[in-house]
Amino acid sequence: MKLHFVKNLADRREIMMNYHLLARGIRDPAVLKAMLEVPREAFVAEGMEELAYDDYALPIDEGQTISQPYIVAYMAESLELSAADRVLEIGTGSGYAAAVLSRIVSTVYTVERLAGLARSAHQRLEMLSYGNIHVLEGDGTLGWPEYAPYDAIVVTAGAPDLPKPLLSQLSVGGRLVIPVGATPYLQMLVRVRRVSEEEYRSEELCPVRFVPLIGAAGW
């Protein structure tokens, strides 16, 4: 795999920070720092590097997309992360969001159902020296039970309902951020807190549009 970088992207990165993140309410210093540190141009399709810091989703391999910078930052901030947290991500894609999370928390576990994406994301993250990210090819709706429980779980695809396997893999006090909706392409971003072994509390954050979450506990 060859990684592609574009010189003189610093100005665009600053525009992203000032106009797409700060101006829209992102305030968590750790999230902002991570968004500045991670080179989004290394995670987009070849030939689209100059668009890396524009605030919209871009196509990647396998007919999938890399989320716009604002939604990556918003979801990370909504997880209410601390440096010692262990995070599970469902939907690795090119690995960009996992890379951002890895600059904030101790360890990231990420699951991708598409073999080609899982393989290329693993290679990319390894080449970029993100040593605290672990990639698994598999059905993300089932989580990654081997390393559960997690302090936070983030899902980057829209589910018809809250996947029970993911709820069960949250630690008490843990947060799940996930798009949920009755149609595959229009959802409400929801944050769920596990307040005890048996009790969960959820709140709606904002309307979003994600690709469908495919799997045994998804579409």
UniProtKB/Swiss-Prot annotation:
Active-site residues, record numbering mapped to chain: S67
Entry coiled-coil feature ranges: none
Any one GO molecular-function label of the UniProt entry: protein-L-isoaspartate (D-aspartate) O-methyltransferase activity
Gene Ontology CC: cytoplasm
Annotated keywords: Cytoplasm, Methyltransferase, S-adenosyl-L-methionine, Transferase
Keyword Ribosomal protein set for record: no
Substrates-to-products reaction catalysed: [protein]-L-isoaspartate + S-adenosyl-L-methionine = [protein]-L-isoaspartate alpha-methyl ester + S-adenosyl-L-homocysteine
Superkingdom of this protein's organism: Bacteria
Compartments where found: Cytoplasm
Entry's family note: Belongs to the methyltransferase superfamily. L-isoaspartyl/D-aspartyl protein methyltransferase family.
Listed name of the protein: Protein-L-isoaspartate O-methyltransferase 1
